[in-house]
């Protein structure tokens, strides 16, 4: 089975259609797999630079505050113990790497599932370009996207050389623009609709379909 979507122009006309291979856009989504991949992707974004000081790292506290016996108070060896104000932290966070190793096949399968979910709900769109001409226009791009979907969160996938399109949508709230080689599960699931330029869609299909890989 092969899905088809109409290719729209900024003028609002239909310029043919493009096929969405079933192997990429009509697979059964694996919810658990997509969750695992997205969790790993978000974990990898964490800086992990958080740090607290233990009682051995806090400045001061080298002298025993008072004698061991005879004061009537509990024995203390340092004013930098965790029960004191200004003392060290017990089991506090230290710098660490949160990234997880996720096999490439799992990442690719999760992306196929996410795209298939959007395709089944008619939330994948194809366009010739975002604006006509060689002059960026945020107003024109916003109007054009509004004709494609009423949803606010849109993922735009265009070629790396399409600077006019990138400049036209980069300041639009709720719109995230990436190139086809940057396509990932989180961005697809985080967006309500995915808008491909024909160039970007063909690039993704040729790079990931079995037919494209054999060419």
Curated annotation (Swiss-Prot):
One of its GO terms (cellular component) is ribonucleoprotein complex. GO terms for molecular function: rRNA binding; structural constituent of ribosome. Residues 43-100 are annotated as: Disordered. Keywords: Ribonucleoprotein, Ribosomal protein, RNA-binding, rRNA-binding. InterPro entries: Ribosomal_uL4 (IPR002136), Ribosomal_uL4-like (IPR013005), Ribosomal_uL4_dom_sf (IPR023574). One of its GO terms (biological process) is translation. Pfam families: Ribosomal_L4. The keyword rRNA-binding applies. It comes from the Bacteria. The keyword Transmembrane helix does not apply. Belongs to the universal ribosomal protein uL4 family. Part of the 50S ribosomal subunit. One of the primary rRNA binding proteins, this protein initially binds near the 5'-end of the 23S rRNA. It is important during the early stages of 50S assembly. It makes multiple contacts with different domains of the 23S rRNA in the assembled 50S subunit and ribosome. Forms part of the polypeptide exit tunnel. This is Large ribosomal subunit protein uL4.
